[in-house]
């Protein structure tokens, strides 16, 4: 089991990296936190972000996914959304340590 300090460090790294990739690609969305779920033998990290410019999606997701895979097996799901005239791709991810 990992310590609380390690969990906090991982959460901060993920938020910082995701936000820097989004900012670099001129995306307006910023991730504010990563959630954790404590299981008996592991910790599950879960988060999501949005990409508004669909032309940026491949570059953004490739860079973020590469970073997330450094933590091991990552489950990544994306869905194109059209909400009140706004179009974006919602991406969720989770992994266990």
Description of each model-found segment:
Residues 58-76:
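Short, non-transmembrane amphipathic alpha-helical segments
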């Amino acid at each position: 089991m990992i310590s609380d300090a390690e969990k906090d460090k991982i959460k901060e790294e993920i938020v910082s990296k995701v936000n820097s990739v989004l900012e670099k690609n001129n995306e307006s969305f910023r991730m504010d936190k990563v959630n954790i779920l404590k299981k008996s033998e592991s910790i599950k990290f879960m988060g999501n972000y949005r990409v508004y410019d669909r032309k940026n999606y491949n570059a953004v997701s490739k860079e973020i996914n590469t970073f997330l895979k450094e933590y091991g097996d990552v489950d990544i799901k994306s869905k194109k959304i059209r909400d009140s005239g706004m179009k974006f791709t919602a991406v969720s991810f989770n992994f266990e340590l």
